């Protein structure tokens, strides 16, 4: 457009997500509407990635980016020193990716990929799967949603019986379908079953707490989808 590359170090912060009773106009997950825009990177805040260094890194690239901030994280502390709780640990050995695990990061029945906004639900599902079903899980939390850093994750994905991608948005043209397509393209011959996608119900989001929980993805939604896939 300009005959040369123009630096544009711009980050647009975008609060997203439900679970706070804000109703249909302040609870949406908008990530999927920006997937595939040329030159636009998408990031999401998580309790594993320090926002300061991450934002500096994004700005240093000189390209536009969106930084999605799930409002449920605003009042939570970051995890530090590789410890989540008495059951779970995490590592950041893969740049930009947190791996949360109870036993070993490289060997699990299920790999659960989830953005930062639903980390708590993903870990609660992983805990329930391990204690009640003896299904081990590794939760993958990327800081960059798009373009998704698939290559360094291929070894752990290749070993899993089930790969599940969970997100709070409604189904259809989502970040999860984009990542699943990439995984299928790379690992289809090695996979035991297609990627399992878990989303919120296709509905406006109620303000009432009990109705909101019925619409939005919960840890039980994730758990049941993984158990069903393994039993199929």
Would you name each region that the model predicts?
Residues 37, 61-62, 132, 160:
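Acidic-histidine catalytic/liganding microenvironments
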Residues 39-42, 49-87:
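Helix-enriched interaction subdomains in cytosolic or periplasmic regions
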Residues 34, 65, 181-185:
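Domain-wide signal for the mature, well-folded portions of proteins, strongly enriched
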Residues 27, 65, 163-164:
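Residue-level recognition of hydrophobic positions within alpha-helical transmembrane segments
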């Amino acid at each position: 457009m300009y005959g040369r590359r123009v630096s544009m170090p711009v980050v647009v912060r975008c609060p997203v997500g439900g679970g706070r009773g804000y109703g249909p106009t302040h609870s949406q997950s908008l990530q999927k509407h920006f997937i595939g825009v040329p030159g636009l990177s998408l990031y999401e805040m998580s309790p594993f990635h320090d926002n300061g260094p991450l934002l500096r890194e994004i700005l240093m690239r000189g390209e536009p980016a969106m930084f999605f901030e799930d409002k449920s994280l605003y009042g939570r502390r970051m995890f530090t020193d590789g410890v989540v709780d008495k059951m779970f640990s995490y590592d950041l050995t893969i740049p930009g990716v947190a791996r949360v695990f109870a036993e070993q990061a490289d060997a699990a029945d299920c790999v659960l990929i989830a953005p930062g906004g639903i980390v708590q639900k993903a870990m609660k599902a992983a805990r329930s799967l391990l204690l009640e079903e003896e299904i081990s899980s590794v939760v993958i939390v990327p800081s960059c949603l798009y373009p998704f850093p698939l290559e360094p994750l291929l070894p752990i994905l290749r070993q899993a019986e089930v790969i599940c991608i969970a997100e709070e948005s409604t189904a259809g043209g989502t970040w999860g379908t984009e990542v699943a397509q990439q995984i299928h393209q790379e690992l289809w011959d090695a996979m035991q079953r297609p990627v399992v996608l878990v989303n919120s119900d296709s509905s406006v989001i109620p303000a009432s707490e009990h109705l909101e929980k019925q619409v939005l993805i919960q840890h039980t939604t994730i758990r049941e989808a993984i158990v069903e896939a393994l039993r199929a």
